[in-house]
């Protein structure tokens, strides 16, 4: 069946096309982007009137945790170990229905989940995976607690090796183990974080030399490295060592911004993440007070940091850290990017064409003839309507031409 979405405003991943357009979908691909009313005159086709609506490429979220279902992880201590995998099926469905058709998982999802989506066992966004998070001992990704217990969050299993490593030999081996387990990219922590109760987001983790070994090992297998990096010293260590993207970037300084521009490093802000922690705490989640205090402390610095990076021209790709907050609300990040100074077109591009470049995937992130029919129909004309609130205006989502 040919589907024709008629008389819509179209954002193609880079710009708004003039006038209104008919988008014709056949066989999982966009076969035509014609002037409004000119897409198809075949009565057998399925014509859907999109007057007053905007069609954008399927959104790419460059930072999710599909096996995590919220910041309040204390229940994990009591849940069966396998529950996380069944919950991830619901998380993937919510992600799709929220308008996200491609994700870069930043730790937790293993090769089995990816294969389940690819083979049609479950429905979910297309994905690349990190498998687990690499961290130094005592770092942001080391979940051994001062109580002596190990948090079940990202606990190792046969498909998800531990990511904790130290020293040049140690990080080399762990990188290879994660790649062996099916990692498409490597996720590291080069600073402390908000959710780790006993470290500081401003403090560095892993040495620059350790990060360089990780980058080299990943590159040897055609993979890139994403770095959880919040404080400026750890951001700069990661950028100098050659990571592809900085995640969060809460305390960027001018030297860090200049380095990112020089090296072409992407920034994935995840503005939703600290807000999600605060919302969870206000809803009664049993989070450590130190975690909630850190989340409150970083929010304004985070916004200012991203605004300065954007003004300087650092490439910004959309990422949410979904799994800290709810899955399915990912497009709220577009609203938050607009609030820190990105134009509507820039905020949409962050989740489409810029994100596709970060992933080095030319099959997604654009709406054009011959491209995959990953599309989101949004209520309202985004050329003139405020993009903020887009997350509540998702009207329809298509994944390779199939209505989700």
PLM region descriptions:
Residues 89, 96-97, 179, 239, ...:
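Non-catalytic positions within long, well-ordered alpha-helices that form the structural scaffold/packing
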Residues 114-117, 211-220, 310, 338:
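Surface-exposed amphipathic alpha-helices with a cationic face
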Residues 8-11, 351-353, 357, 369-404:
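C-terminal cap of metal-dependent C-N hydrolases
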Residues 220, 285-381:
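His/Asp/Glu-enriched, well-ordered alpha-helical/loop segment
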Residues 1-42, 53-55, 381-385, 402-403:
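N-terminal metal-binding scaffold of metallo-dependent hydrolase/deaminase domains
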Residues 53-119, 137-144, 209, 233, ...:
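Metal-associated gating/positioning segment near the N- to mid-region
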Residues 121-290:
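Metal-coordinating catalytic core of metallo-dependent amide/deamination hydrolases
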């Amino acid at each position: 069946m040919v589907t024709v979405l008629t008389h819509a405003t179209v954002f193609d991943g880079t710009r708004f096309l003039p006038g209104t357009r008919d988008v014709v979908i056949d066989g999982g691909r966009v076969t035509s982007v014609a002037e409004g009313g000119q897409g198809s005159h075949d009565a057998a086709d399925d014509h859907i009137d999109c007057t007053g609506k905007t069609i954008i490429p399927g959104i790419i979220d460059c930072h999710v945790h599909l096996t995590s279902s919220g910041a309040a992880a204390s229940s994990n201590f009591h849940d069966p170990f396998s529950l996380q995998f069944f919950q991830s099926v619901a998380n993937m469905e919510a992600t799709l229905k929220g308008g996200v058709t491609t994700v870069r998982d930043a730790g937790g999802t293993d090769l089995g989940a990816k294969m389940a989506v690819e083979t049609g066992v479950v429905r979910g966004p297309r994905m690349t995976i990190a498998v687990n998070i690499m961290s130094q001992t005592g770092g942001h990704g080391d979940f051994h607690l001062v109580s002596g217990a190990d948090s079940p969050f990202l606990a190792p299993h046969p498909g998800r090796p531990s990511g904790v490593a130290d020293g040049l030999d140690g990080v080399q081996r762990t990188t290879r183990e994660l790649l062996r387990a099916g990692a498409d990219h490597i996720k590291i922590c080069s600073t402390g974080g908000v959710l780790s109760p006993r470290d500081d987001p401003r403090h560095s983790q892993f040495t620059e030399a350790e990060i360089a070994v990780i980058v080299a090992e990943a590159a040897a297998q055609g993979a890139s490295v994403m770095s959880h990096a919040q404080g400026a010293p750890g951001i700069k260590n990661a950028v100098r060592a050659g990571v592809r993207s900085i995640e969060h970037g809460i305390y960027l300084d001018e030297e860090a911004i200049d380095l990112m521009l020089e090296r072409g490093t992407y920034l994935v802000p995840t503005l939703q993440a600290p807000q999600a922690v605060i919302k969870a705490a206000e809803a009664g989640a049993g989070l450590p007070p130190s975690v909630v205090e850190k989340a409150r402390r970083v929010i304004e610095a985070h916004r200012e940091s991203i605004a300065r990076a954007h003004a300087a021209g650092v490439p910004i790709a959309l990422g949410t850290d979904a799994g800290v907050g709810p899955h399915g609300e990912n497009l709220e990040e577009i609203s938050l990017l607009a609030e820190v100074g990105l134009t509507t077109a820039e905020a949409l591009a962050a989740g489409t064409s810029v994100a596709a470049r970060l992933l080095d995937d030319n099959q997604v992130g654009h709406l054009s003839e011959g491209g995959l029919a990953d599309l989101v129909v949004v209520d309202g004309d985004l050329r003139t309507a405020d993009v903020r609130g887009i997350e509540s205006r998702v009207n329809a989502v298509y994944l390779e031409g199939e209505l989700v």
